[in-house]
Amino acid sequence: MLTSQDHEIEAAAPIDMLDAYYAAHGWERERHEDEIIATAPGSWTSYELRALWREHDSVLQFLAFPDIKVPDDRRASLYEAIGLVNEQLWIGHFELWSSTGVLLFRHAAMIDGDEEGAMSLGAAELLVESAIEECERFYPVFQFVLWGGKSPKEALAAALVDTQGEA
């Protein structure tokens, strides 16, 4: 839980801001010069969160891994599910890494150069929380397709009905 003391940090370099944000939540994290990796809890699984800062482009790439590895024989149907899911998203997208079969959510944020590459706490919170929320929202779709015997369309319909019923 973030405290009023945590909100005193108004802006910092993107990796510094994410490091402070993760620390405030008590999440395990590993930091490198232009990269930070953290583990965040979710209701379905824990998420590995990776952020990579490309200073010369002023771009922060953010990845969330929902701990789903797709077997070769299920990839075609999962690609279809990813396409249907991505149609529902305004920001970011899901993809499947062909070399490893790992599913992930990817988003990139351009950090305004006028602020000398600084990221606000609000921007960090929005980036992290929106990635986790989308992973949580669509995790059941991928599970239904992979292990529940549903078609991608059936899985999406079932998952969206289930989430609409939650309070």
List each model region and its residues.
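Terminal, regulation- and interaction-focused segments at domain boundaries
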Residues: 1-17, 65-68
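Short histidine-centered catalytic/ligand-binding loop motif
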Residues: 5-6, 63-71, 117-120, 124
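Ser/Thr-rich, low-complexity intrinsically disordered terminal regions
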Residues: 20, 24-62, 67
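A generic structural motif
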Residues: 36-37, 101-107
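Short, internal acidic amphipathic alpha-helical interface segments
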Residues: 65-104
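Long, hydrophobic, amphipathic alpha-helical segments used as structural scaffolds
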Residues: 90-93, 97, 138-150
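Long, amphipathic alpha-helical coupling/dimerization segments that relay conformational signals between
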Residues: 108-142
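Short, highly charged C-terminal tails/helix-capping segments
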Residues: 143-167
